[in-house]
UniProtKB/Swiss-Prot annotation:
Membrane topology: Multi-pass membrane protein
UniProt protein name: Diacylglycerol O-acyltransferase 2-like protein 6
Organism annotation: Mus musculus
Cellular component, GO, one term: endoplasmic reticulum membrane
Gene, per the UniProt record: Dgat2l6
Localization in the cell: Endoplasmic reticulum membrane
Catalytic activity: 1,2-di-(9Z-octadecenoyl)-sn-glycerol + (9Z)-octadecenoyl-CoA = 1,2,3-tri-(9Z-octadecenoyl)-glycerol + CoA
Length: 337
């Protein structure tokens, strides 16, 4: 009986670790957006708000530069429960020499990019042990860093804005040993996420190649097998009012928040039930061989296209070499749009 109780407790802690993830950002954002004005206007604690605003002004560019990473936050026990919920695994196929900087491309986006977050923004899968002397910076939407408290929380995890200024700084201010992680499919790719489907947007994504050429950073493919299995996604039939409503909600979400609001469902609080928790499906992120890139301050179109094709070939090779090992058939194809 004690063994069953222990197992139930562990399962409960894993579930709670997932449940807290998005609400924490909402809570921190609400505290900063509503709490500070309230203290300023309606309480005798207004000096705290003034000091906080002065600090924000002073600290405004930190997230664009080196951030404020905390090894303590990245090693929270919370993330071990988060990682073991699926579970998530990090697999290295080649060493990353600390003599270079890197752009690691994470595919696919999935619904919430669990694999990228756990492997690169926490130490629950041992990134620092697997890739010693490499400092990872997971890139996400720049707008999130406009929200006080949220930006500090993200910086403590080593997360940075996916902006040209921020990424260029991290790839040039330190000669070697930095790795920025980009999810090139972005919000649009989340709409492609479905169990059993391996489809990504890449053929028109040239920004990361230009960045690599301008900074001389090596390109590194990575693929999270199982990422698309974490949620079921519904796309309603064309011509129905449900599809009309779905399209408009997605347009509004993309315009205002920079994200696509997907119609998803997963499991409930108990296994086998229906709800909005992700399915407990293993996610294995395989990091491939670095692709050397020359430093060219002003690369022409042909050079950019050449290295994009080289990268696509490297990604296909990585996918095909490991797909059968991580749950896909040997004939399963990666579709690149």
């Amino acid at each position: 009986m004690a063994a069953f109780s222990c197992l139930d407790l562990q399962e409960g802690l894993r579930t709670l670790s997932i449940l807290q993830w998005i609400p924490v950002y909402v809570l921190l954002g609400t505290l900063s957006i509503l709490g500070m004005p309230y203290l300023l206007l309606f309480t005798t604690l207004w000096p705290l708000s003034v000091l906080f605003l002065v600090w924000i002004a002073y600290d405004w560019n930190t997230h664009i530069q080196d951030g404020r990473r905390s090894a303590w936050v990245r090693n929270w026990t919370l993330w071990k429960y988060f990682q073991s919920y699926f579970p998530v695994k990090l697999v290295k196929t080649h060493d990353l020499s600390p003599k270079h900087n890197y752009i690691i491309l994470s595919h696919p986006h999935g619904i919430l990019s669990y694999g990228a977050f756990i492997n690169f923004a926490t130490e629950s899968t041992g990134f620092s042990r697997v890739f010693p002397s490499i400092t990872p910076f997971l890139a996400t939407l720049e707008g999130i860093f406009w929200i006080p408290f949220v930006r500090d929380y993200l910086m403590s995890l080593g997360i940075c804005p996916v902006s040209k200024l921020s990424l260029t700084h991290k790839l040039t201010q330190k000669d070697s040993g930095n790795a920025v992680i980009i999810v090139p499919g972005g919000a649009s790719e989340s709409l492609l996420s479905r169990p059993g489907v391996s489809m990504i947007y890449l053929k028109k994504r040239q920004g990361f190649v230009k960045l690599a050429l301008k900074t001389g950073a090596y390109l590194v493919p990575s693929y999270s097998f199982g990422e698309n299995e974490t949620y079921n996604q519904e796309t309603f039939a064309e011509g129905t009012w449900l599809r009309f409503f779905q399209k408009n909600i997605q347009k509004i979400g993309k315009r205002i928040l920079g994200i696509n609001l997907c119609t998803i469902h997963g499991r409930g609080l108990t296994r086998g039930s229906w709800g909005f928790l992700p399915f407990n499906h293993p996610i294995t992120t395989v990091v491939g061989e670095p692709l050397p890139v020359p430093k060219i301050p002003d690369p022409d179109k042909e050079t950019v296209e050449k290295y994009l094709e080289l990268y696509i070939s490297a990604l296909r090779k990585l996918f095909d070499q490991h797909k059968a090992e991580y749950g896909l058939s040997k004939t399963h194809e990666l579709k690149i749009l």
